[in-house]
Amino acid sequence: MGVYAITGLRVISQLEKQEHETINIDWKTGDIQADLSIPEGRQKVIDELHELHPEGLDGLILCAGVPGSCHDLRLILSLNFFGTISIIKGAYDLLEKKGGSCVATVSNAISQGDLRMDLADILNNNNEDELRILDLVSNLDENDLLTGNRLYVASKYALARWVRRHSASYAANGVRINAVAPGNVNTSMTATMSVDEKTALNALPIPTKYGKETLMEPDEIASAINFLISKEARGVNGIIMFVDGGTDALLNSEKVY
């Protein structure tokens, strides 16, 4: 199970322990089952959310995503970026009714990864033209891992920027929106990596894990998400919270904004 799936499940577990009602959206096993990489699946989610809770939503958390190594460049953009912003926009009126909040999951790679900034700009400035953008990346080599990783970082960078751009107008109508940028996380997928793969992954330092040869835990990411979605964070809006044990601060110590 990948980082996005396991993080989403841990978020649900924490919320249910606090006796919140939750709705799990997943393409296979969710309370609402839909493919967020296609417009029809997104509309199904939006319609069912309105049917289930016409009175509004207290919170919306978007954890769906695929890595750059999935060998499907269209999927990277359609799920990581277009799927996420479509659900946020489609459920916005439900959040507005209850003064709810929204958290999207990006990645700490946005501050350190090798990305296609031209593509990030296209995503942000032409996000109503999904099909044309997907056709554009279809011409790239999806078996090239570097290309996949660059598109992955671009999709998450564009999502983080989308959150920032919309945060002020959303908050003016009572809806907070923030993003969490996780570092490398322990999952069933990382557990099955080869020794060389684990060595490469651990080469990226995590200050809070020094000497432990381990990664961030899913519950650490989930706790940050649940804080941002809660009333305790009512003064927090438009931030990208790095939950990476200090990796971003270590690599970008001179950047304060």
State each model region's role.
Residues 181-192, 196:
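Short, flexible catalytic-loop segment of classical short-chain dehydrogenase/reductase
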Residues 25-41, 49, 62-65:
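Rossmann-fold cofactor-recognition segment
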Residues 65-70, 98-172, 184-187:
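Catalytic loop of short-chain dehydrogenase/reductase
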Residues 1-23:
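Canonical Rossmann dinucleotide-binding motif of NAD(H)/NADP(H)-dependent dehydrogenases/reductases
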Residues 207-221, 232:
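A conserved structural motif in NAD(P)-dependent oxidoreductases
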Residues 93, 168-169, 234:
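Alpha-helical segment proximal to the catalytic Tyr-Lys
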Residues 176, 236-238:
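Short, small/polar-rich loop/turn modules that mediate ligand/substrate recognition or access, typified
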